[in-house]
Amino acid sequence: MSTFIGQLIGFAVIVFLVVKYVVPPVRTLMAKQQDAVRQQLADSKTAADKLVEAEGAHAKAIEDAKADAAQIAEEAKADAVQISKQLREQADAEVERIKVHGQEQIVLQRQQLIRQLRGDLGAESVRRAGDLVRSHVADPSAQSATVDRFLDELSQMAGSVGAAKRPVPGGYSGMHAASRESLAAQVSTFRETAASLDSSALSALAEDIAAVAELLISELVLRKHLSEPVDASENEAKLTLVNSLLGNKIGAPALAIVRSAVTARWSASSDLITSLEYIARLALLERAERDGQIEDVEDQLFRVSRVLDAEPQLATLLSDSTAPAQGRVALLTNVLGGRANEVTTALLAQTVRLLYSVRAEVAVLDVAELAVARRDESVAHVKAAAPITDAQRTRLAQVLGQIYGRTIAVQLDVDPELLGGLVVNIGDEEIDGSLSTRLSAAALHLPN
């Protein structure tokens, strides 16, 4: 019994301890657990509600997406139809463009082919014509006939021009009026002075005048001073200077001409040198005429001119003003080799010494034309495919004389490339009646 009571008391103590210390925490824990369960249930309900809402939103989004997809598909179909239409239109336009371009290309190629065929046919025709002409003019009589036909045409030209005197360019026509008047005055002074001189004195005069011109070429300040226009009262100073410089170095005839030249009015200082050079040439030509050698001198001068034209290297060496004049004159003398007479040699040496603004071949041609012009003649430089007869030369000179109103001296060069006819040059004018030029003109006027 006591055991039972003891056990009961122990049980009661245990119950008390459990109720006192175990039950409150358990209750608290259970309350918390219940709150947690309730919260979870609430959250679960909220989640379920959100799930329902999400499912509804998803379904709505699917419906909207289907509607948008249907609209996009309709728009895409419409765009596809429009694009297909545009592509068809573009393709049709491109086909039409290619078709038109192809037709244009066909037309252009046809025209080009026609032009090429015309050009080839024309060129072949000209070539064949050239062959026929060359074959024809191989006969000397036919060659001569081409010259006669040219002379006939030239005669018709002479009839249409009339007898009015035409100006022929000269080597000194580039001077201004004042210089031309002064040069004419110096020529008059020379003629008065030369009237009393013999051949040797004329040569001495030419040498003295050329020496003065050579001095003025090298002494620019002196040339400028002597050629400057001054009042009549100041001319005495020029004359005094000339006397002091040249009085004991040149002869009295040359000194008189130089004194006259420095008191004249010149448009440019170079014109003073040109006038002295002109007088020096006239002195030698006057000697040649008095000695009966003028025609030989003319012929030799023209021959040398043609040699210089044919030998540009020789002309360049003679024209090199930086080389000593003595060396250039020696070169000229070696080239002449004694084949020119004394006057021609002196004229050529003088010309080479005084070169300073023109080439040798031009200066020599000027001297040759001056020799002819002294007799109121002009020179016609004529080219022919073959030598012409004396009768043709005479007729040519007569016809040209009718055209230019003055005597014409004919200088002939042979150039087989002309084929036939003649080419006439007088001064700056050219009359081209050669067959080669006519063939070239025919080739230029071929249809395109």
From Swiss-Prot:
Keywords: ATP synthesis, Cell membrane, CF(0), CF(1), Hydrogen ion transport, Ion transport, Membrane, Multifunctional enzyme, Transmembrane, Transmembrane helix, Transport. It comes from the Bacteria. Disulfide bonds: none annotated. One of its GO terms (cellular component) is plasma membrane. Pfam families: ATP-synt_B, OSCP. It is found in: Cell membrane. One of its GO terms (molecular function) is proton-transporting ATP synthase activity, rotational mechanism. Residues 169-448 are annotated as: ATP synthase subunit delta. It is a single-pass membrane protein. F(1)F(0) ATP synthase produces ATP from ADP in the presence of a proton or sodium gradient. F-type ATPases consist of two structural domains, F(1) containing the extramembraneous catalytic core and F(0) containing the membrane proton channel, linked together by a central stalk and a peripheral stalk. During catalysis, ATP synthesis in the catalytic domain of F(1) is coupled via a rotary mechanism of the central stalk subunits to proton translocation. This fusion protein includes a component of the F(0) channel (subunit b) and of the F(1) subunit (subunit delta). Two copies of subunit b and one of delta together form the peripheral 'stator' stalk which links F(1) to F(0). In the N-terminal section; belongs to the ATPase B chain family. In the C-terminal section; belongs to the ATPase delta chain family. F-type ATPases have 2 components, F(1) - the catalytic core - and F(0) - the membrane proton channel. F(1) has five subunits: alpha(3), beta(3), gamma(1), delta(1), epsilon(1). F(0) has three main subunits: a(1), b(2) and c(10-14). The alpha and beta chains form an alternating ring which encloses part of the gamma chain. F(1) is attached to F(0) by a central stalk formed by the gamma and epsilon chains, while a peripheral stalk is formed by the delta and b chains. PANTHER family: ATP SYNTHASE DELTA CHAIN (PTHR11910). This is ATP synthase subunit b-delta. The lineage of its organism: Bacteria, Bacillati, Actinomycetota, Actinomycetes, Mycobacteriales.
